[in-house]
Each structure stands twice: as structure tokens, then as C-alpha cells.
Amino acid sequence: MNITLITVGKLKEKYLKDAVNEYAKRLQKYCKLNIIELQDEKTPEKASLKEEKLIKEKEGEKILSSIKDNSYVVSMDLKGKMFSSEEFSAFIDDLGVRGNSSIDFVIGGSLGLSDAVLARANYKLCFSKMTFPHQLFRVMLLEQVYRAFRISRGEPYHK
């Protein structure tokens, strides 16, 4: 299975880079992981709603150009469906059974995802009603993908 993580913004803190690298290393056994970091657009301190929409649209264009035609796209969205770890594992397994060999997980910028990206998404996923820093969320998502593979194979890790 090919898993691509498409994110807006770059990791800055070393400890987060180390965590991402650790989960990327662990995931090598289960999938081919590709991480695409897209440049975020600068958001003025007091941006108007119109400016925010334009920024999301620009970031959305970058995201859409990074998605392959045959990819199953899962966007991170506060209005998406929440899963337990077991349900998330079953979701990924089911995608594989249905012949989806490429899954793109999309994490938007600080303003979220554009309407065009949300429209392209095959599935909208929500981890929590809380808001997380985008850099930290990247680690959380990779950990849950790793956990999902371990659960589906009945390997020790998940308790």
C-alpha cells in the first residue's frame, strides 16, 4: 500500500522531525510512505474573510496538484467522521480490500482546507473536536496509521 501525507507547512522543531522520522521508519515494514510538504501562504495578522478564503484557495491549488488521479483522498476536517483506533484500522484494511492501493491523507494549513480540496476528498476524517498544532498533528496521524497496521496484523502494540 502507498500512503502519502500531504501537508501545508514545514516541520520546524527537531523533536517533531525526530518523531515523524521514527514513525516513517516503523511504517516501512507495512507501506510505502511519502510525505509532501507544501509551502504555506503568509496570513496577515488581521486577515479579512476574503483574504483568508484566497489563502485557502492558493494552498488548495497546491494540494490538488499533489494528489494523483488514482489516489483515495482522506482529508482532515473538523466536520469529518471520528474513529476509534480499531475502526481506523478496519477502514484502512477495507480500502486495501476494495483495491485502493494509494491513500493520500491531507492536512491543511492554519486556516483549514479549501472547498475544492474538501470536494475532492473521498472521505473526511476528524481526530477530535479539539484543534491541534499542524506540526504535532502530523505525528499523531502517522502514529495512528502505524497503530492501524499493527492492529490489523494482530501484532502487539495497541492496548
Curated annotation (Swiss-Prot):
Enzyme Commission number: 2.1.1.177
Subunit structure: Homodimer.
Keywords: Cytoplasm, Methyltransferase, rRNA processing, S-adenosyl-L-methionine, Transferase
Protein name per Swiss-Prot or TrEMBL: Ribosomal RNA large subunit methyltransferase H
Stated role: Specifically methylates the pseudouridine at position 1915 (m3Psi1915) in 23S rRNA.
Main location as per UniProt: cytoplasm
Similarity comment text for this entry: Belongs to the RNA methyltransferase RlmH family.
Localisation: Cytoplasm
One of the Pfam families matching this protein, by short name: SPOUT_MTase
Catalytically driven reaction(s): pseudouridine(1915) in 23S rRNA + S-adenosyl-L-methionine = N(3)-methylpseudouridine(1915) in 23S rRNA + S-adenosyl-L-homocysteine + H(+)
Residues binding S-adenosyl-L-methionine: 108, 127-132
Any one cellular-component term (Gene Ontology): cytoplasm
Gene Ontology terms, MF aspect: rRNA (pseudouridine-N3-)-methyltransferase activity
